[in-house]
Amino acid sequence: MRLHLAGIIPIANMKTDHENPLPEVPVDNGFSAIQKSVYECAMAGCSTIWIVANDDLIPLVRKTVGEWAYDPVYYARNYSKFYKEHRKEVPIYYVPIHPKDRDRRDSYGWSVIHGIHSAWRTSYRLSQWIVPQKYYISFPMGLFDVGQVREYRKEIKDKEKNFFFTHENKTVKDDLPLSFTMTGEDFKLCRRHINKKTSKEYLPPLP
């Protein structure tokens, strides 16, 4: 069965050095931070992309990135006669933070956990056969050459091993906003860890 890699882009509770509350900081000409993350997830081979944001920001973010993206790997295969027919669309879903969690579960890490749980829960309600087996987390403010993501696409989608981008031998574990992958079991462990740092006792059911 084909791996369902779900891309998670946390925006809620994101802290930046800029006054702009949206991840619209330009990283290139006509290319914003949120667009970078969407492109990165598509390049990594994600089957779906889930953007976690507060209700008031979702309409603005949706206007910027839309409802779907193309998988860049399949977008322009010029060696194929009918390459346009083989283009793959990656649906984008928007996940609001529950009002009860605001100002209580207010860490950036919780936005990631909430996005993963929402992706699992929504998929499971449709069919257990489309539940994500792995998650790719992309931080809008984590800047690097996203073109190199394609080189590691196979490793990123490995069912058995997690993948971490590094900078000077440091990863997200060192509080750097660098992309990484995790499984459902990793999700459970991280959720318990983050829960210890928050005031709210309620936990959503385990996937």
Model-derived features: where do they sit?
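Conserved beta-loop-beta/alpha segment of the NTase-like Rossmann-fold superfamily
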Residues: 79-198
